[in-house]
Amino acid sequence: MLDLKYIRANPEKVQEGLSKRNKDVSIAPILELDERRRKLLAEVESLKALQNQKSKEVPKLKKEGKDVTDLMNELKDLSDKIKELDSKVKEVEDEIEKILLTIPNIPHESVPVGKDDTENVEVRRWGEVREPDFEIKPHWEIGVNLGILDFERASKVSGSRFTFYRGLGARLERALINFMLDLHIEKHGYTELFPPFLVARKSMIGTGQLPKFEEDAFKTTDDYFLIPTAEVPVTNYHREEILKEEDLPIKYVAYSACFRAEAGAAGKDTRGLIRQHQFNKVELVKFTKPEDSYDELEKLTADAEDVLKELGLPYRVVLLCSGDLGFSSAKTYDIEVWMPSYGRYVEISSCSNFENYQARRANIRFRRKDGKLDYVHTLNGSGLAVGRTLAAILENFQQKDGTVVVPEVLRKYMGTDVIK
């Protein structure tokens, strides 16, 4: 959530920043409501001062033996009027918060201005793209041929965009999860959390999924939500807390299943593992001091990249332009893995700095050594999306005979060096 005081003090700067997102977002309604709120508050303070003044007259008049009936009636009228105005103030404040929750974050000054993903900027590439001397098969075909992925039975059981992982497919999925967790814990210094997969509405509001994107979420009848990412429970782990400056940055890694309705994804990536209603992901989350957050974003992105380097998968890093930026993010790097059957790079991780946007919504602060309270900056990124990583392994390490070579770092988890 944006800071109302900052909006009030810098309306043109805020509107200019939001306009870079190429979305129709106006802060005019916020400013109008804020002005109304301030006028109401001034009126309340004026009436309270009058009430206080007249209240002091009561004992004085009583001492003089004078009738205070009219004065008491006047005080009652003042009290009723103050209550009425307080109620109006509350209504206006609720409306301000309601609108604030629908306004996205302001892009960081280093984010390139652009309308959509065609104007994202490539930052770097790693690894060599293989050019095999045989016809490349897509991962879903490889998986079915090897008997390790079963889309047909998953469709029978659950509908479209679900998958059964079978035999070495299930083992490969599990190996990837364990490898990613071990790497981030042992090499990168993250603390593991294993979070709930169901969260309350307040948690979804805290990270910015609600109220804007409720149609993309799976909701239960009692107002719980299946998590779209472990970002939600892990960020809310410190909701309504005051952290210690000396404990920052706090770094968590969490495996979870993720659930997405993909309401706006009709016709996109309908085959394979790229766009599923349920998928596994290892998530990285950081809580940092504001002055450190952009350095920490670079480190977090490097940590996610390290997974692909260890696996030997070619990838590139892309800086998202303002028009492609996620709702809550101030700056995002996408990591895209090479997918031979697509003939292009496909997103496998988004690493973002939300600055204090989520922290304000979730009220996560820290106390500086001088005693001052400040909001933390929150960051997160996939480290990585497991199903997409598995798909990339099948495609990049497929052999002419239909087998798939297991990356060396996974062999101790798999107990084999080839899937056949």
Swiss-Prot record:
Which protein are we looking at?
Serine--tRNA ligase
User: What does the record say about domains?
Assistant: Consists of two distinct domains, a catalytic core and a N-terminal extension that is involved in tRNA binding.
Spell out the reaction equation it catalyses. Answer: tRNA(Ser) + L-serine + ATP = L-seryl-tRNA(Ser) + AMP + diphosphate + H(+); tRNA(Sec) + L-serine + ATP = L-seryl-tRNA(Sec) + AMP + diphosphate + H(+)
Q: Does the keyword Cytoplasm apply?
A: yes
Q: Which organism is it from?
A: Caldicellulosiruptor bescii (strain ATCC BAA-1888 / DSM 6725 / KCTC 15123 / Z-1320)
Q: Identify the residues that bind ATP.
A: 260-262, 347-350
Query: Which CDD domains does UniProt cross-reference here?
Result: SerRS_core
Q: How does it assemble?
A: Homodimer. The tRNA molecule binds across the dimer.
Write out the transmembrane intervals: none
Q: What's the EC number here?
A: 6.1.1.11
- Its main subcellular localisation, reduced to a broad class, is cytoplasm
Q: Indicate the enzyme's highest-level EC class.
A: ligase
Classify the source by domain of life.
Bacteria
One GO CC term, this protein:
cytoplasm
Q: Which residues bind L-serine?
A: 229-231, 283, 382
Q: Which GO terms describe its biological process?
A: selenocysteine biosynthetic process; seryl-tRNA aminoacylation
Q: Which NCBIfam families match?
A: serS
Instruction: Give the UniProt keywords, A-Z.
Output: Aminoacyl-tRNA synthetase, ATP-binding, Cytoplasm, Ligase, Nucleotide-binding, Protein biosynthesis
